[in-house]
UniProtKB/Swiss-Prot annotation:
It comes from Paguma larvata (Masked palm civet). Involved in oxygen transport from the lung to the various peripheral tissues. The modification N6-succinyllysine is found at residues 7, 11, 16, 40. This is Hemoglobin subunit alpha. Keywords: Acetylation, Heme, Iron, Metal-binding, Oxygen transport, Phosphoprotein, Transport. The modification Phosphotyrosine is found at residue 24. One of its GO terms (biological process) is hydrogen peroxide catabolic process. The modification Phosphoserine is found at residues 3, 35, 49, 102, 138.
């Protein structure tokens, strides 16, 4: 459960990320593909090389979904319902991959914003990514 302090930290961090969200999303995807090669199996039709336009475009989709979630912290299930359906019924993404991407998102944000990445912010973002992952996998059951 996200506390009010967590929500404030998430919103403040996302405000600082601003126009870099798509760039960070792509970087986190690249980190995921390099660190956890099995995640590549969901993207057989993508050029997964560094700087690929397809990875950048998907990174922007990830960032846009997270931006949507930040704007709906009080009701993540409704805000992410369509994405949950997509990942559960059409894409059939193994739920563990959300944890792997979440970890890579945390690393990416920490690298770009080390001064702002306090323990409280780290904890809030970790809880947020976990909550988003839970919603995205909720329809698997």
């Amino acid at each position: 459960v996200l506390s009010s302090a967590d929500k404030n930290n998430i919103k403040a961090t996302w405000d600082k990320i601003g126009s870099h969200a798509g760039e960070y999303g792509a970087e986190a995807l690249e980190r995921t593909f390099i660190s956890f090669p099995t995640t590549k199996t969901y993207f057989p039709h993508f050029d997964l090389s560094h700087g690929s336009a397809q990875v950048k475009a998907h990174g922007k989709k990830v960032a846009d979904a997270l931006t949507l979630a930040v704007g709906h912290l009080e009701d993540l299930p409704n805000a992410l319902s369509a994405l949950s359906d997509l990942h559960a019924y059409k894409l059939r993404v193994d739920p563990v991959n959300f944890k792997l991407l979440s970890h890579c998102l945390l690393v990416t944000l920490a690298c770009h914003h080390p001064a702002e990445f306090t323990p409280a912010v780290h904890s809030a973002l970790d809880k947020f990514f976990s909550a988003v992952s839970t919603v995205l996998t909720s329809k698997y059951r």
